[in-house]
Every structure is written in structure tokens, then in C-alpha cells.
């Protein structure tokens, strides 16, 4: 089981495939998605990684969180979340996950907070048909009608669909297709709609109901540090000289 990522919802647009068909996509952006802490079986009783994304002002970060980020040698993060992983896919603290963590064609599950709609009636909230428009109906055109039966059972059952607060809930949409990724800009293009408003934080994970593609990097797609890049460049230069 691999780690997921935290991304920010930018909005929706459309792209075209090789045959000229347009595909509606949601654009998600990863901004400095780094491992902030580890959770191990020996110390915590489970295995997970804590990721942080975005940048937060130091003055708006609590003293406890400043110490937490300093221990990981990362800048203060705007959003922090944990992802359960298998022991072999545990990531080092400070590692940065890139957008090519997911591959085109892969299925993912996305989790976000749906847009709040406030108090709504049953026609909008539950897609009820409403009452009659004429023939004796007055002031009851959009009501839900009866909510119970008679003296027995003499109550309204729990879960009855009625008017109430709509939206602003944690929603997970499963099996969305990754259309493409842009590592340089940290973009993930996902087919279809993603719950949440523009600017909201979205958790993106490997789909639990679809197999992981063989091309998916394990344990994750990690951005090479400057030191590693310099070593790789020096090695390549040495091989070229030989």
C-alpha cells in the first residue's frame, strides 16, 4: 500500500485526446508535498506517513507546529494529513513526492469537503418530485408530504429524508481516471468532478477497487535532492569522459 498525496483543487477545464474527443478534467496542484513525520509499528502501533503541503506564514503557525516542522527540517505547511502505508513503502522524513507519483490511466480515489449549500428542501436535497401544482394544492407544492404512518408505530423513523443542511461533508469519489500529470508544475489532471470548492485541499490515493499499474513508482515518486542531482551529474560526466 503506497502513500497518497495532498493536492489543492484549482478548478475544471477540458483536454483533448488523440482522436479529438474532449475530456472534462479537474486540475489538482501539489505544492511542496513533503513527508513531515513517520508512524511506525514499534512506536505508534501502525505504519503511516504524515505529509505536509503548501506554505504557511510562521506568524500564523503555532509554537508546537513550528517545533514539529523544525524537527523535520521543512518549512511550515498549510495542510497536514496522514496516509497509511505498508512497512516497505515507508518514506523518509523530508522526502518530496512529485506529481508523477500517479501514472496516466491509473484509477484514484479522491476525498474532499463538498461545497456547502445551507438549509435546503427535499426537492433539491433528495431529488423529491414535489406535490401537485393545482387542483386543491395550496402552499404544499415543494413539501415532502407525510413523514410517518399512524398511531402504530407512532413515530418518524431515523434516516427519514427531510429538509436540512446540505453539503459541507467529507466526500470520497472512487475510481476517477488520471488523464495526465505535469511534474514541473506539480499538476494532476483527473477525469470528471472532484468534491470541494476551488482552493480546497484534496486527498488523492490509489484506488482500493482497481489494481495498481505496474508503471506506478514504488515506494513513491520522490524528487531528487540537489546533492543527489549533483552526484548523478558528476557520475554521468565521468562516464562520458571515459
Curated annotation (Swiss-Prot):
Residues 131-165 are annotated as: Disordered. Methylated by PrmB. One of its GO terms (biological process) is translation. Disulfide bonds: none annotated. It holds the Pfam family Ribosomal_L3. Signal peptide: none annotated. Keywords: Methylation, Ribonucleoprotein, Ribosomal protein, RNA-binding, rRNA-binding. PROSITE patterns: RIBOSOMAL_L3. The modification N5-methylglutamine is found at residue 151. GO terms for cellular component: cytosolic large ribosomal subunit. Residues 135-150 have a biased composition (Polar residues). GO terms for molecular function: rRNA binding; structural constituent of ribosome. HAMAP family: Ribosomal_uL3_B. Part of the 50S ribosomal subunit. Forms a cluster with proteins L14 and L19. One of the primary rRNA binding proteins, it binds directly near the 3'-end of the 23S rRNA, where it nucleates assembly of the 50S subunit. Belongs to the universal ribosomal protein uL3 family. This is Large ribosomal subunit protein uL3. The gene is rplC.
Amino acid at each position: 500500500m503506497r502513500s497518497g498525496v495532498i493536492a489543492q483543487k484549482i478548478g475544471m477545464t477540458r483536454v483533448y485526446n488523440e482522436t479529438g474527443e474532449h475530456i472534462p478534467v479537474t486540475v489538482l496542484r501539489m505544492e511542496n508535498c513533503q513527508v513531515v513525520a513517520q508512524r511506525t509499528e514499534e512506536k505508534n502501533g501502525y505504519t503511516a506517513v504524515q505529509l505536509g503541503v503548501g506554505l504557511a506564514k510562521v506568524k500564523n503557525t503555532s509554537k508546537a507546529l513550528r517545533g514539529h516542522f523544525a524537527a523535520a527540517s521543512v518549512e511550515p505547511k498549510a495542510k497536514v494529513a496522514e496516509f497509511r502505508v505498508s512497512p516497505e513503502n515507508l518514506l523518509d522524513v523530508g522526502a518530496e513526492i512529485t506529481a508523477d507519483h500517479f501514472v496516466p490511466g491509473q484509477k484514484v480515489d479522491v476525498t474532499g469537503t463538498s461545497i456547502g449549500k445551507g438549509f435546503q428542501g427535499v426537492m433539491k436535497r433528495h431529488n423529491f418530485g414535489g406535490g401537485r401544482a393545482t387542483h386543491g394544492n395550496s402552499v404544499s407544492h415543494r413539501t415532502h408530504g407525510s413523514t410517518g404512518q399512524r398511531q402504530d408505530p407512532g413515530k418518524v423513523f431515523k434516516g427519514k429524508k427531510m429538509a436540512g443542511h446540505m453539503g459541507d461533508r467529507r466526500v470520497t469519489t472512487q475510481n476517477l481516471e488520471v488523464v495526465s500529470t505535469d511534474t514541473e508544475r506539480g499538476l494532476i489532471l483527473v477525469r470528471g468532478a472532484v468534491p470541494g470548492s476551488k482552493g480546497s485541499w484534496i486527498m488523492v490515493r490509489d484506488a482500493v477497487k482497481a489494481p495498481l499499474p505496474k508503471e506506478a513508482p514504488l515506494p513513491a515518486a520522490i524528487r531528487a535532492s540537489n546533492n543527489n542531482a549533483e552526484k548523478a551529474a558528476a557520475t554521468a560526466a565521468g562516464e562520458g569522459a571515459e
